């Protein structure tokens, strides 16, 4: 947009290695909100998962405890028999095998259910995100990098997938395992349990220190990744500009700078995270060795009633106890990273939606036998404003296309006004042209008509109705807009034209294309109106894309047109074709036109000259030329340049 706007804000990123690190705000609140999303739709599934986790954990504990019985009651007595019978031992092994099978089945069922819960939750979150995104005001997209928004849908949502499918189930499983194993160890030998707990305390201390360091960098990594994605998208969209100005090296330098920051934060995060498992594993081995040594001494001396079977069962439990503690430490980093992603997700979801206090609606209308406007259920070609009043009555006013600005002031950011005391009107069927230097405020005025932004002072009336009273969807439905930057969607040519009015028939779309003089080039495409367009219509010329945008506006058949730089990017021959089509389209409609080529607005009913957000001249082409003011300078300069 040519006008002054709020500066694009890139989210706060991590500072240098010695500076303060970003932190997740209210991690407990974030986790509670995530789980609320899960429980809202999958509470029965989560209960079943919890049961499976408990069964699996208890099966593992029971299998470890069975070692004591196996050794003390079966194996040792068999060694003392001259002709031992293996039948009792085989029966015992079958029983322990059944325990393991139950644990495996519970773990398998748990994994299957969690896949369903995780993917369903992420689907719901993405749907909520997209639904909310569609309700956000244009100002949000003007002030947030699009790549950063995309990163929320991809990277941040993916970190939640890891947390929901792996980290949280693992934490729950570890917690249940730790409690059950601890109780079993105490039952076997409280002395050996004390030895184990001393080593566990050391493991927890080391894990806490490592997690504190890695957590800072995981958050920084997530935010740096968003910046890299934003930069890549920006360079992809502007690749032609980069090549035209031969700034490939400059673009590469910018990417390397961001990529190096991502590498540094990721390296630091993973360096700390990757040493956690080896450290805990070695501490676990030390704990195992100490317990084996102490247990053997106790078994030999008969201290505390410890037997060889007790020692073997306890050592198995010792491994089962140390493993979940290591897993908890490892999953802590994943959860911190996921919470950083969740913070960005919920921050976007908590952005205030576009407000709409309007209550006047646009309806299909017809005249009854008394020549009064009444509401119609079918499309009649007559539009009317349905205006309910405080006294309970409702009036209908035919949509004419009369737009008036009265003492309008506006600024994109508080304290910085870009439009000052704007007074203008567009009567039904008139063509109003805005001209002026770049940044004068031309496009800003059109943004106010469709309420992409709201004014700070003054009034804008549409058919005598304050536009703040008109529901935004109905206001915009009455406007046909050809934006400065033409955007085409993935789909056929016909579908892109029909986007202007989704219920339009093929015949109406073709008629709109003919009106815009696009029918000729469309028929020359490989599949005509069924030709697929991808990548924003990259297989079409700029002029052809502009013609399709005009056809899209034409099929909506609006009473008011806003043409923002509609022909500024089209060659002279194509412009002549477009101009003839546009003249037909604008006939009988209120039209607001912005164009760099002043020759395209010579036949305007009124030309408004803007400079630094103020109207400095207005009148017809001949009147303004006779004044020899700003318009004269622009016009003669334009002619000389051409």
In which residue ranges do the predicted regions lie?
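Transmembrane helices of ABC transporter permease
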Residues: 41, 45-58, 99, 166-220, ...
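Juxtamembrane helix-loop junctions of ABC transporter transmembrane domains
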Residues: 20-28, 52, 59-75, 99-146, ...
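Hydrophobic alpha-helical transmembrane segments of ABC transporter permease domains
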Residues: 32, 51, 106, 110, ...
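Membrane-integrated ABC transporters
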Residues: 1-60, 75-96, 110-114, 118, ...
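Helix-loop-helix
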Residues: 77, 184-198, 268, 272-343, ...
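ABC-type nucleotide-binding domain
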Residues: 82, 365-642
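Short intracellular "coupling" helices and adjacent cytoplasmic loop segments at the cytosolic face
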Residues: 13-22, 119, 127-151, 155-157, ...
């Amino acid at each position: 947009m040519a006008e002054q706007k709020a500066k694009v804000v890139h989210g706060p990123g991590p500072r240098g290695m010695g500076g303060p690190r970003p932190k997740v705000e209210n991690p407990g609140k974030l986790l509670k909100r995530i789980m609320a999303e899960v429980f809202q739709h999958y509470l029965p599934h989560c209960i079943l998962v919890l049961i499976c986790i408990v069964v699996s954990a208890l099966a593992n504990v029971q299998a470890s405890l069975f070692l004591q019985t196996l050794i003390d009651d079966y194996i040792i007595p068999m060694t003392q028999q001259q002709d031992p019978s293996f039948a009792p031992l085989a029966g015992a092994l079958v029983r322990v095998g059944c325990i393991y099978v139950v644990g495996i089945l519970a773990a398998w069922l748990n994994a299957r259910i969690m896949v369903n819960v995780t993917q369903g939750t992420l689907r719901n979150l993405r749907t909520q995100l997209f639904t909310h995104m569609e309700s956000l005001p244009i100002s949000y997209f003007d002030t947030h990098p699009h790549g950063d928004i995309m990163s929320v849908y991809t990277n941040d949502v993916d970190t939640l997938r890891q947390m929901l499918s792996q980290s949280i189930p693992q934490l729950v499983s570890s917690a249940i395992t730790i409690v059950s194993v601890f109780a079993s160890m105490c039952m076997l030998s409280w002395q050996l349990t004390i030895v184990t707990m001393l080593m566990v305390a050391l493991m927890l201390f080391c894990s806490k220190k490592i997690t504190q360091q890695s957590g800072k960098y995981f958050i920084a990594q997530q935010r740096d990744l968003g910046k890299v994605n934003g930069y890549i998208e920006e360079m992809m969209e502007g690749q032609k500009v980069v090549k035209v100005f031969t700034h490939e090296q400059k673009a590469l330098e910018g990417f390397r700078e961001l990529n190096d920051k991502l590498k540094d934060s990721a390296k630091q995060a993973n360096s700390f995270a990757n040493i956690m498992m080896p450290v805990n594993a070695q501490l676990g081995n030390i704990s195992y060795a100490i317990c084996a040594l102490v247990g053997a001494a106790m078994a030999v001396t008969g201290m505390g009633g410890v037997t060889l079977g007790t020692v073997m069962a306890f050592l198995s439990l010792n491994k089962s106890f140390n493993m979940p503690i290591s897993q908890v430490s490892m999953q802590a980093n994943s959860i911190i990273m996921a919470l950083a992603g969740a913070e960005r997700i919920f921050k976007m979801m908590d952005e205030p939606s576009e407000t709409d206090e309007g209550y006047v609606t646009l309806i299909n209308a017809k005249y009854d036998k008394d020549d009064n406007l009444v509401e119609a259920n079918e499309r009649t070609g007559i539009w009317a404003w349905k205006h309910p009043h405080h006294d309970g009555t409702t009036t209908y006013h035919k949509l004419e296309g009369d737009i008036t600005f009265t003492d309008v002031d506006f600024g994109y950011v508080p304290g910085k006004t870009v439009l000052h005391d704007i007074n203008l009107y567009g009567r039904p069927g008139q063509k109003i042209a805005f001209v002026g230097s770049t940044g004068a405020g031309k496009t800003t005025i059109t943004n106010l008509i469709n309420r992409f932004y709201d004014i700070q002072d003054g009034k804008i009336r549409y058919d005598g109705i304050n536009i703040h009273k008109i529901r935004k969807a109905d206001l915009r439905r009455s406007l046909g807009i050809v934006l400065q930057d033409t955007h085409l969607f993935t789909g056929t040519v016909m579908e892109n034209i029909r986007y202007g009015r989704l219920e339009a028939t093929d015949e109406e779309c073709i008629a709109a294309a003919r009106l815009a003089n696009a029918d000729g080039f469309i028929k020359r495409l490989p599949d005509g109106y069924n030709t697929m367009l991808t990548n924003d219509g990259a297989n079409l010329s700029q002029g052809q894309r502009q013609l399709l945008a005009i056809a899209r506006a034409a099929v909506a058949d609006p009473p008011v047109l806003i043409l923002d730089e509609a022909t500024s990017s089209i060659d002279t021959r194509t412009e002549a074709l477009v101009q003839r089509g546009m003249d037909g389209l604008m006939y009988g409609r209120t039209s607001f036109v912005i164009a760099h080529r002043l020759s395209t607005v010579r036949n305007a009913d009124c030309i408004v000259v803007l400079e630094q957000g103020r109207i400095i001249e207005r009148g017809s082409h001949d009147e303004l030329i006779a004044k020899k003011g700003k318009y004269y300078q622009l016009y003669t300069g334009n002619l000389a340049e051409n």
